Amino acid sequence: MKGKGRNRAVKSLEIYVRKLAQANGIKPEMAAHIFHLIYEETPNGGISDDDLESLTGYKQSDIRRILRLLGDKRIIVSRKGRHPRKEATRYFWRIDSDTINVSLLTLKKKVLEKLVVKEAHDSGNSYYTCPRCGSKYSFDEAFTLDFTCPRCGEVLEEADSREGLERLRRTIDALREEIARDESRIYRS
């Protein structure tokens, strides 16, 4: 990852880390902070959980929980090392560009899969919107509501979803191309 691509990838990863943390009952800002410290120390061989604790003031149990989560998702990797003054083994955490690229590719494929499902669903269904408040309902929902908005009482109108579907299809095509480029870069022989 170089230049603008690196910055975009780091921002995407930070968003992903925050969502992962939140889904696992961890404070998103804490996980993002740990991620950024690891990212900054990766060129220096990584950072230990002891160093993360002294730099952040976070409890070691919280730090290790975040490290385990990021490690399980292959965002970070560890290596064993010796503590300079103790006989204890330390683990140094760093971002490995190979595993992170594969993780990002996997994430993109999951997003693509969801978009394809949405496109299939949206192309096979009609929607109704409220011209006053903008609420959107499927045909079945609108039928149940007698084509009247439950929020404001306005008559629902059939939505023209062609433009939205076209935009969704362009997004799907662009993501497929990006995935193909990433796969050729990651798996080239």
From Swiss-Prot:
An example Gene Ontology molecular-function term: DNA binding
SUPFAM superfamilies in the cross-refs: Winged helix' DNA-binding domain, Zinc beta-ribbon
TM region positions: none
Domain HTH TFE/IIEalpha-type: start-end pairs: 9-101
Superkingdom of origin: Archaea
Keyword set, alphabetical order: DNA-binding, Transcription, Transcription regulation
Record GO biological process: regulation of DNA-templated transcription; transcription initiation at RNA polymerase II promoter
Keyword presence, Transcription: yes
Gene3D superfamilies associated with the record: Winged helix-like DNA-binding domain superfamily/Winged helix DNA-binding domain
SMART domains: TFIIE (SM00531)
Keyword Transcription tagged: yes
Comment field on protein domains: The winged helix domain is involved in binding to DNA in the preinitiation complex.
Job description of the protein: Transcription factor that plays a role in the activation of archaeal genes transcribed by RNA polymerase. Facilitates transcription initiation by enhancing TATA-box recognition by TATA-box-binding protein (Tbp), and transcription factor B (Tfb) and RNA polymerase recruitment. Not absolutely required for transcription in vitro, but particularly important in cases where Tbp or Tfb function is not optimal. It dynamically alters the nucleic acid-binding properties of RNA polymerases by stabilizing the initiation complex and destabilizing elongation complexes.
Quaternary data: Monomer. Interaction with RNA polymerase subunits RpoF and RpoE is necessary for Tfe stimulatory transcription activity. Able to interact with Tbp and RNA polymerase in the absence of DNA promoter. Interacts both with the preinitiation and elongation complexes.
Family: Belongs to the TFE family.
The protein's name in its UniProt record: Transcription factor E
